[in-house]
Amino acid sequence: KNCWGLIDEDINFPKHYAINKKVVIKNDVWLGAIILSGVTIGNGAIVAAWAVVTKDVPAFAIVGGSAKIIKYRFDEDIINLFKEVRWWNWDDLYLKEHSDLFLDKSKFISFVKENKDECIRHI
C-alpha cells in the first residue's frame, strides 16, 4: 500500500507535493487546509478551511486563502504571556485541576496573568 498504507495503488505525486521536508504543527492549532512540506504552524494558530500553506504560520495567527495572515487571535501581550507559560505543556494534574478555566477565555487569561509564576512551575 502507498500513501501511509491507505491506498493500494501507486500514485505519482507532482514534484511540488513530494514529501521531502518535515511539517511541524505546534500546540493548540486548528487546521482545515493543505499544508506543504517544510512548513511550521506556530502554537495556537488557526488555518482556515481550504487555505494553502506554503510558508510558516506565526504563533496565534489566523490565516486563510494562500495562508495570508488575517489577524491574530489575541493581543501581543497575551500572545507573549501564553508563550511564556506554555499551558499546553502543563502537567496532567495541573491541567485537570484547572480544566474549568478552558471553558471561559476571560477567566483563563485572568488566571494565567494572576498566577504566572505558578503556571510556569507546572510546565
Model-assigned labels for residue ranges:
Residues 25, 31, 35-37, 41-42, ...:
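Hydrophobic face of beta-strands forming the core of extended beta-sheets/solenoids
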Residues 64-73:
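Nucleic acid-binding interface residues in structured DNA/RNA-binding domains
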